[in-house]
Amino acid sequence: MKSTVEQLSPTRVRINVEVPFEELKPDFDKAYKALAQQIRLPGFRPGKAPAKLLEARVGRGAVLEQVVNDALPSRYSEAVTSASVKAIGQPEIEITKIEDGELLEFTAEVDVRPEITLPDYSELSVTVDPIEITDEAVEEQLLSLRQRFGTLTGVERAVEDGDFISIDLSATVDGEAVPEATASGLSHEVGSGQLIEGLDEAVVGVKAGESKEFTSTLVAGDHAGKEAVVTVTVGTVKERELPAEDDEFAQLASEFDTLDELKADLRERVARVRKVEQAGQIRDKVLETLLETVEVPLPEAVVKAEVDAALHDAVHGLDHDEEALNKLLEEQGTSREEFDKDAKESAERSVKTQLLLDAIADASDVTVGQDELTERILFQAQRYGMAPEQFIQQIQQAGQLGAVFADVRRGKALAGVVEQATVTDTSGAAVDTAELFGNGEAETEEAASTDEAASDSTESEDQK
């Protein structure tokens, strides 16, 4: 087999492949074997009919078609490997010549990873906010802890912000009841915004046993995107009573004997959180600087695939009705044109980030150990409230294990850049990135390189 590569653009190539027919003998044998199992010829046991008789039955053209279709994927992969083509996504294959018994020729156009010129990381510099631990932040943590140990007590008054209520909900659209928007005995914290839009404002001032109507836009179901009249009936009203802020509470809620000891521990926790936040800010600013200074040609097909994925996600909860999406966007004060523009910009940034960090990882020979991959998987399983075995099975079935690997590798690549960059806070003090990121590796999920909200398009395309 012979192959040559033409560079069509920085992100696309055409591979020209010539395959002599003698190299297709295994493919012909496979095709005849499959036909022998499918076709019964008098005088021959199943699977034993001669190739010439099988060919006479189905025609030479049908055999050639089967052989070529079976041979193309493996010959394409062989050409990609032999030419060290860094292909992304599915190729567009065109058969250009078939000389029966002599030669098969085809071309394959495919997107590729572009060549990227990387900067001197030591010349990068960013400025971030300093770590500040205020008394107010400690008091917020203490209040949160007291709320966890609070008790709910029924009250004989109208609903106020922060109360806990039980409610019944029903809704109509154009006078017709909406069954999927009907519920009874729901528990809700007023002001949390966890249920339907407009509910928190509607229930304030309502007493137990009373009802109130308000309007809200439905976001799912057959009436998604439509304005509904919602009726809420308040069943019970409870307020949360907080324990006193004293030594007794410290002993109840922690391992400490005094409130001062508990506050000291909370201050240390706030400090750890602030360090993680600063690490995230450093990561984001270094990445932003890289994206601004490094030119990365973008493969159009990969960007389009990510835009299409964003649209698919947006209409998934709307029964894939794009008109419903357009109406919903209009009600939200935006438009489909703005949505498409934002989706394209987001896709371009996501693809550029992935390609850039992959190039940095390649140049730095970044590797990922099994323990690092396992640590990330365990973290994500915990994050989604799943057993590790269940999470692993799910990502394997979805073909996303490679994406997790790539995400860890990109995180390590970016951490290596951060280690070489100059980082100061707004007061002018140098920031010790080694303390936050370790020896060139991100040690926390927050210090990882890529936003998991964005799909890992280049990795998923590589696997196709």
Curated annotation (Swiss-Prot):
EC primary class: isomerase
Domain PPIase FKBP-type: 162-243
Catalyzed reactions: [protein]-peptidylproline (omega=180) = [protein]-peptidylproline (omega=0)
One MF term in the entry's GO annotations: peptidyl-prolyl cis-trans isomerase activity
GO terms under biological process: 'de novo' cotranslational protein folding; cell division; chaperone-mediated protein folding; protein transport; protein unfolding
Location within or outside the cell: Cytoplasm
InterPro entries recorded: PPIase_dom_sf, PPIase_FKBP_dom, Trig_fac, Trigger_fac_C, Trigger_fac_C_sf, Trigger_fac_ribosome-bd_bac, Trigger_fac_ribosome-bd_sf, Trigger_fact/SurA_dom_sf
A single Gene Ontology CC term: cytoplasm
The EC number(s) this enzyme carries: 5.2.1.8
Keywords assigned by UniProt, alphabetized: Cell cycle, Cell division, Chaperone, Cytoplasm, Isomerase, Rotamase
Residue ranges of the region described as Disordered: 435-464
Record bears the keyword Cell division: yes
Domain comment quoted from the record: Consists of 3 domains; the N-terminus binds the ribosome, the middle domain has PPIase activity, while the C-terminus has intrinsic chaperone activity on its own.
Reported function: Involved in protein export. Acts as a chaperone by maintaining the newly synthesized protein in an open conformation. Functions as a peptidyl-prolyl cis-trans isomerase.
Matches recorded under PANTHER family: TRIGGER FACTOR CHAPERONE AND PEPTIDYL-PROLYL CIS/TRANS ISOMERASE, TRIGGER FACTOR-LIKE PROTEIN TIG, CHLOROPLASTIC
Family under the similarity heading: Belongs to the FKBP-type PPIase family. Tig subfamily.
Name of the protein in question: Trigger factor
